[in-house]
A protein has these predicted regions:
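Structured alpha/beta or helical-core interaction and ligand-binding surfaces enriched in interleaved
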Residues: 1-118, 123-152
Length: 152
């Protein structure tokens, strides 16, 4: 890649994004449901491990179609990560850390952060968006774009 990894990530974090999530849409701020209690439930074991495996399924299958260029906690970057290492890094990042995955030669980005119950996909092409939607659905997850409505 012509520019460095961190610069590419920084630019992509400003791009339109979609959420890969266990929920089918954004929960409104004024929802009468128990989003935070449910989110905490999914952050506990064994639910968290199951959720991590669903996300790993998406990334590993995506790696069959596209190169993944991965950085963990802002450290070194790896192209063609071993599937077991990618699983380990993602699981660790979702517990306590941060993972950045560049896709399509740095045109798109997936991030995972500790304490989150979702992945975030930035700047996908229409083809990548459709592929990730299919992979997420197959893994029992949803792909949605956040609302610009301030009530959400």
């Amino acid at each position: 890649m012509e520019t460095n990894f961190d610069q590419i990530v920084e630019q992509l974090l400003e791009a339109p994004y979609w959420v890969i999530d266990f929920l089918p849409m954004q929960v409104p701020q004024d929802s009468k449901g128990q989003f935070f209690a449910v989110e905490q439930y999914y952050l506990q074991e064994p639910q968290h491990e199951r959720l991590c495996h669903q996300f790993v399924d998406v990334l590993l299958k995506l790696n069959c179609y596209s190169d993944l260029f991965v950085s963990r906690d802002g450290g070194d970057e790896w192209l063609y990560p071993d599937p077991k290492m990618l699983e380990k890094w993602l699981t660790e990042s979702l517990q306590n850390g941060h993972l950045c995955v560049l896709i399509d030669d740095g045109e798109a980005l997936i991030t995972a952060s500790g304490g989150d119950t979702n992945l975030t996909l930035y700047n996908p092409s229409p083809a990548l968006l459709e592929l990730v939607r299919q992979l997420a659905t197959a893994a029992g997850l949803f792909l949605w774009q956040p609302s610009t409505d301030r009530n959400c």
